[in-house]
Amino acid sequence: MTPFEHDIIDIHIALESWLGAGEGHVDALLARFQPDFLMVPPTGAHLNHDALARFLHAQRGSRPGLKIIIDELATIQSWDNGAVLHYRETQTRPDQPVNVRWSTAVLNREGETISWRLLHETAQA
C-alpha cells in the first residue's frame, strides 16, 4: 500500500471517530487538507477549506455509530509529490440506510506530509 493509499484509510478512520463519536482533534484533521482544498460532495455543491471547517465543527458526534468502510482503492496516477486515487466509501449507521459513494481524490506530498487538494464524490444509486 502506498503512503497515499494509507492516507485515504487513515483520514476516514479520523472522520469516523469525529463524526460518529465526537472523538479526535478537529484542528489536526483540518490540517490534512490544503488551504485551497475543494470538495464536491454527492449534492454537487462546492466546498472549500472554510466550508469543510464549518461542517466538521458543527457535525462533531452527530452520526452516532457511524462506520466507514473503504474498498476498491486504486491509484489512478502518481508522480513524485502527489497522486490521484479512486475508491468506494460505504457509510453505515444503526437504523439508517447504507450510504455508498465513489470518490476521486488528489493528494499531494511535501516532505513526509500528505495533504488533500481535491475530493469529488458521486453517490452510488
Residue ranges and their predicted role:
Residues 2-28, 38-125:
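A beta-strand edge to alpha-helix "cap/lid" segment located at domain peripheries
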